């Protein structure tokens, strides 16, 4: 029997099955222990310091107790705390991005994904570089600046060379005032050498969903293909960081396994990255199993109700206060709105989850990875966020100013990142409004920018931001940043 060790590089030790089961038992035993719950909540509260703000975060056991808690007033207190922590680290900014699917060729047999190799219904597509150019121009014409590229695992069709060439193509395209300034990458677990190549290509965050942390379930859900190797997949983030990638993104596909198990495993993975590399996950994604071609979410026994889903989001924010939390267009407008109040800091907008989908007038369903619930345009999403009091941010400055990895975390964990992110969000929002927004969205947006500029505490920084906003409005000058 292996022993739990967050500093180990062996998957069975840093994601330890026995420790997860003991954690779930401990949480169940203490789910109405008010004294313990209060002490956990107090530990997690933001504390002001001479350098800004400090948040302790929680261990996987402490976080699991909060998740298990079913005392209504304590759950409400958790939700308020999650929002308070989100405000302390990220303010009212919401980072915008879009996925770009390059290829749905795949050699794996994942039973929850329509790209699995046995699916004969789905239309297999791999974009050429010219087609990628067309997709990127379509995304730029919406106003997007940040992409997450996606591809199935196929060493022939989707080689690392193809991925690298695609990244180079994406960064090279500047259409009108458009530009993609950050490319995040969501591809299969690979080698240290290949992660070095991705680093050299200038990627932002490397994202890899664990799918499930339960090894027995994992092997059943991935019966064939290279992804069947649980250890290789689970240890991928360590290889990525060894390869020089500063920012990594975690996530599980909720609904495949019991949510208590997945939550504990996710928290342990975050603790492991902190223990070994001194840097926790840059992002955590919270997708749920959704309907797609050849996939019925009702076939899985662990589907997640909205109230549990919301509670998970709040507990992640409280436990890992510095992480960027992502929710995609898998979820409806109503669910996404609730999640914004519980700690989500990044959302996708106007997403197409099919290969080549952005250049199609009609949403192509025959190559989608999952059905999109929120089908609004980017302008509608931006308008909606501003009506709710949020600042839609298209900023990518940290990545290009070297604020990544431990440098980003040192600023984020003290709340000092707001000194850069707040004005940068306003300037990139101004770019969006001038270049892409509808008249109604412009009106709301410029009023919001003026109100938010007045909140910048440093007089010099406020004046620089004002001057830059004026320059964006009156010229084609773009890409100002702190």
Predicted segments with their positions:
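An N-cap/entry alpha-helix motif that binds or orients negatively charged groups
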Residues: 49-94
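Core AdoMet radical
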Residues: 117-134, 138-240, 246-256, 278-285, ...
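Radical SAM enzyme core and accessory elements
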Residues: 1-52, 337-342, 351-482
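Conserved C-terminal portion of the radical SAM core fold
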Residues: 151, 205, 231-295, 304-334, ...
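Generic structural signal for well-ordered alpha-helices
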Residues: 98, 136, 164-171, 195, ...
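Canonical Radical SAM [4Fe-4S] cluster-binding loop centered on the CxxxCxxC motif
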Residues: 90-91, 95-131
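Short glycine-enriched, charge-decorated loop/helix-capping segments at active-site entrances
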Residues: 221-227, 298-302, 367
